[in-house]
Regions:
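Intrinsically disordered, low-complexity regions enriched in acidic/Ser/Thr/Pro/Gln residues
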Residues: 1-157, 162-163
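N-terminal-biased segments
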Residues: 137, 148-186, 256-257
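Short beta-strand-to-turn element immediately C-terminal to the catalytic PLP-Schiff-base lysine
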Residues: 155, 247-249, 286-287
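A charged, well-structured terminal subsegment
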Residues: 248-260
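Nucleotide and nucleotide-moiety/phosphate-recognizing core
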Residues: 261-306
Length: 306
């Protein structure tokens, strides 16, 4: 995405100092002005700033649809963003300093933390959660090359829908919310996977967008667990490999069947016909005047041509 720069550095290893080149993450401030009023300065990776700004305003509750945004302009070179909204923002805003990288800001944390979700009946198989995290890991090229970049994605049982990278984990979700706004995508009932820690500001943003499941490679905070429990969100932490820890609303996760037990004819074929319980080879049992395995082969011959 062009968010890195090459720098000459000194590398100390095994008692020796040598010069080398290293990729470093770009960090850029963005001064946000809304309706002529300077609202905040966002510190973020310098790409797709329109998504970041729109998502930030959406997650703060200032906009709901693109119709609420009359004009939005950003300038990466000068680090400014100017927005004209159809409605005025509140005159008195009480900012909350969040636990995000570089200390994020939220204006609506208390307003969203206990608002229940509408789509409570949405369920996800564990395999879909694993597949989403694997897709996220494959896309996170910057993190593998030099670290310092967070990533997040939103999707459903059909797969990944939106993906974002940023040096701030809270910014990744703002970017996703903004892109969904531009593309008119409804995120209600979707799941969010993230590389970063799940804290209260992340949950508050998820509640506002109708996200029903959040999964992270790392740990959640105690307040985020309580917020997810109250809002009806399934919260997953420490998702690594083929395991995860589920902190709230386990009823939404459908466990995968035991891959070691396949029942019926398919199980007999794949198991080689052996039966520990019967102490015999089931494929050799008589069926319609022939062996069971011969009958299976005959059926398969009728179904599939050479």
């Amino acid at each position: 995405m062009g968010d890195t720069l090459k720098r000459r550095i000194q590398h100390f290893v095994k008692g020796q100092m040598c010069q080398t080149e290293r990729s470093v993450v770009q960090e850029a401030p963005l001064r946000l002005t809304v309706n002529g009023r300077e609202l905040a300065t966002l510190v973020a990776s310098p790409h797709q700033l329109n998504f970041l700004v729109a998502g930030f305003l959406r997650n703060q509750g200032f906009v709901d649809t693109m119709d609420d945004i009359l004009c939005l302009g950003t300038c990466q070179e000068f680090g400014v963003a100017n927005v004209r909204l159809a409605r005025e923002i509140p005159a008195q805003l009480v900012p909350t300093l969040t636990s995000g990288c570089g200390t994020g800001i939220s204006f609506n944390l208390a307003d969203t933390e206990l608002r229940p979700l509408q789509q409570q009946d949405v369920c996800y198989p564990a395999t879909a959660v694993f597949a989403m995290m694997q897709d996220l890991n494959r896309r996170t090229e910057q993190y593998r090359s030099h670290g310092g970049i967070h990533s997040a994605a939103v999707g459903d049982n059909s797969g990944l829908l939106l993906y974002a990278e940023d040096l701030g984990r809270h910014n990744t979700f703002d970017r996703i919310a903004g892109e969904a706004l531009f593309r008119d995508l409804d995120l209600a009932g979707k799941m969010l996977v993230t590389s970063g820690r799940v804290s209260t500001e992340m949950v508050a943003k998820a509640v506002r967008l109708g996200i029903v499941l959040i999964a992270s490679r790392t740990s959640p905070t105690n307040m985020s667990i309580e917020m997810c429990e109250a809002a009806g969100i399934s919260l997953i932490g420490y998702q690594r490999g083929d395991s995860f820890e589920l902190y709230s609303h386990p009823e939404r996760i459908v466990a995968a069947p035991d891959p070691g037990k396949i029942h019926g004819v398919t199980g007999v074929i794949l198991a080689g016909g052996g039966s520990l319980r019967m102490q015999s080879d089931k494929s050799l049992l008589p069926l319609q005047g022939a062996r069971f395995i011969d009958h299976v082969h005959g059926v398969l011959d009728e179904l599939f041509e050479e």
